[in-house]
Amino acid sequence: MHPFNIVSRADIARLPRAKPDSASSGGSFAMEKFATALEMVTEMKPDLPVFAARPHAAGRAARWFINNFPGEVAYAYKANSSVFLLGALYGAGIKQFDVASVAELEDAATIPGVRLHFMHPVKSRYAIRRAYFDYDIKCFALDTEDELQKIIEETDGAKDLELFVRVSVPAKNSRVPLEHKFGISGQKAQRLLVKARQVADELGITFHVGSQTTTPDAYAMAFEEVKKHIVKAGVVVDAIDIGGGFPSRYTDSVPARLSDFIEVIKASMAKMPVTEDCRLICEPGRALVAEAESLIVKVDLRKPGNQLFINDGSYGALFDSAHLGFVFPVRLIRPGLDPNEPLEPFEFWGPTCDSIDHMKGPFMLPASVREGDYIEIGNLGAYARAMGTRFNGYGEYIDVILQDEPMYSIYTEDLEPIARNA
């Protein structure tokens, strides 16, 4: 169960099958637990798509980062705000959260003892004021002088601000480059660092190497850019926030080992012109929760050409597959399935009437897959739940907890046994 006993408004709306847990207080929810997806579909035979959480996987990922990253670990709240995964992260020791909106900070602020970072570089005046005065948030990101002025004005010239200047860095080998919308470069960056230093209690630099970055040299290149800005601006920097970008494993994406990323980050940080007490912060999202949730869908129809029509799609949890081309691992969930049956490539169509509701794949499944079968789509814990809509009236899910292992894991060095009955 969720260790701090909260359920957000969004999660309550998603729990049509949740049952109140009479053994606990505060309105918590007892989700149905199953050993495997096969056990779940055999018992429930769901008509709705099912989000299958594996909180133990989120906890393991959090412990790995806390034990191996040479600094502070803050979770990127936008990746997945499921109450079950947040509980696992919090229970494993994640006590800092990167939020990007008033709604996110309102939800995250209900968690006891957490520290929030408002790292969206462009915020409304209302959001800045709410964050500072109502939620005691001191930490803000920015990438323009105009945003700096907004922060100064809306905090009434506060003297306790932690200001992080977002600089642009190369997005090498990232699946989703992020350097175009946010980030300042060149002399403008150096001028902004100087101006922010004049009003900040703590000055930081932040960057993002891009989402699903598969090679660690991207961080080395980013640190080199940051080093140039610090030297040319001639400022003392109190913190460096390297953002997220840490990868997960997918069918079409096999990244370098996480330990290789950590070694590059350690070596790069050692070369930075900063004091010994300079804070180093990371904000993983995908790497913490991707393995911790999967989606179980039902096949509504099979058409010639290995086309499967399923009950969720691009307007739901499969946005990244449809629009960014991610190929997630899949497996057929059917009692008595022959494990040696040959696999064939399939493409998916979602349930809406829109023709762009299409996931090209290829998704490798047994040749006999048919209407009425269930398919588990794995490693969907990052952004799938967050991207869902109610287009065409779809977007309703069942939530369950599974106690088996995810299809892929990048935490192979963690041999910690799973407490299946916890």
For each feature predicted by the language model, list its residue ranges:
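Conserved active-site and cofactor/substrate-binding residues in soluble primary-metabolism enzymes
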Residues: 53-60, 80, 84, 146, ...
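Active-site-proximal loop/turn and secondary-structure-junction residues that shape catalytic pockets
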Residues: 79-81, 103, 122-124, 144-146, ...
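A charged N-terminal "starter" segment
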Residues: 1-161, 194-200, 232-236, 402-422
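Short beta-strand segments
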Residues: 76, 143, 162-168, 206-208, ...
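Conserved, mostly hydrophobic/aromatic
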Residues: 58, 78, 101, 131, ...
